[in-house]
Amino acid sequence: MSSLVSHRARAATASLLLASVALSGCSILGGARNSADISKLPNIPEGQKQQLVSQMQSASGSEKQEIAAKATALSKMVGTELVAVDPPSIIDQTFKLDPKGKTVVNKDDKIYLMMSATDYWRLGQDTYDLCVEQDCEYYSSWTVDVEGSGADLTYVWTLKVDGDDQPKEPLVRRFKVGK
């Protein structure tokens, strides 16, 4: 009989603990849950972060979850090995933004050239700037968007090069999270 009471007491305690976590608004999984959380996330360009906060403030229930997931994915991209899935010439090659401002890429792979042949990076106003040198005197500014979620999460890097002699369409690279 005492074992049954003990089991019920443990079950009740566990239920109360889960309920208190849920009511406190904490996320067991981490990440952004509201616009204040988004504004605190690192590794997102300030202009893009402000857009996400603005979108969050005017969004409804499920839209808020999508915006929070996008912001969290962008923040977590730094330090994560990305595996190219498009264009075909760089499929399965890896690229990473190191948290200390360096790019991690095999310079013998084509992806090195296709990602501006850079060794450093920084956050721009609305972009991730890939830099030739640490002082970023010469750099290319890439916007990064997120498509899908979970195992289907894709980071879409886009570079628009201005000039009459440049392609009309932007350069696009797609990445999945490495295993």
Walk through the language-model features, giving the residues of each:
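Bacterial N-terminal signal peptides that target proteins for export
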Residues: 2-16
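C-terminal motif of bacterial Sec signal peptides marking the signal peptidase cleavage site
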Residues: 23-25
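Bacterial signal peptide processing site
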Residues: 27-30
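Immediate post-signal-peptide N-terminus of mature secreted/exported proteins
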Residues: 34-56
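Tryptophan-anchored aromatic micro-motifs
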Residues: 50, 54-92, 119, 123, ...
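N-terminal glycine/threonine-rich, aromatic-flanked beta-hairpin/loop signature
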Residues: 86-129, 135, 155-157
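Edge beta-strand at a domain terminus
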Residues: 114-122, 159-179
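An anionic, turn-rich surface loop/hairpin at beta-sheet edges
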Residues: 126-148
